[in-house]
Amino acid sequence: MANHKSALKRIRQSAKRTVANRIDKARMRTFAKKVLAAVEAGDVELAQQTLRDATSVISRTAQRGVIHTNQASRRIARLNSHVKKLAVAAAS
């Protein structure tokens, strides 16, 4: 256990940030799962709508510094490719 006042404060701050970051990451994963569920169901309209929502949430998570911007871009790109494949298959 820390002995210095500043170290104790850092522990408190770190715990507080950890909780907030965990909530943000969980929210991001939930939105990504909604997109994938819509793709699995074959619903193009719902997939596109949930992709917009997920993109917003993922970008905000990166903006807050919870995840790296490259990771956010990669997640968005992968979700986007799933939705595009579905749209192309539905159009055919």
Curated annotation (Swiss-Prot):
Binds directly to 16S ribosomal RNA. One of its GO terms (molecular function) is small ribosomal subunit rRNA binding. GO terms for cellular component: cytosol; small ribosomal subunit. NCBIfam families: S20. Keywords: Ribonucleoprotein, Ribosomal protein, RNA-binding, rRNA-binding. SUPFAM superfamilies: Ribosomal protein S20. This is Small ribosomal subunit protein bS20. Belongs to the bacterial ribosomal protein bS20 family. PANTHER family: 30S RIBOSOMAL PROTEIN S20, SMALL RIBOSOMAL SUBUNIT PROTEIN BS20C. GO terms for biological process: translation. The keyword RNA-binding applies.
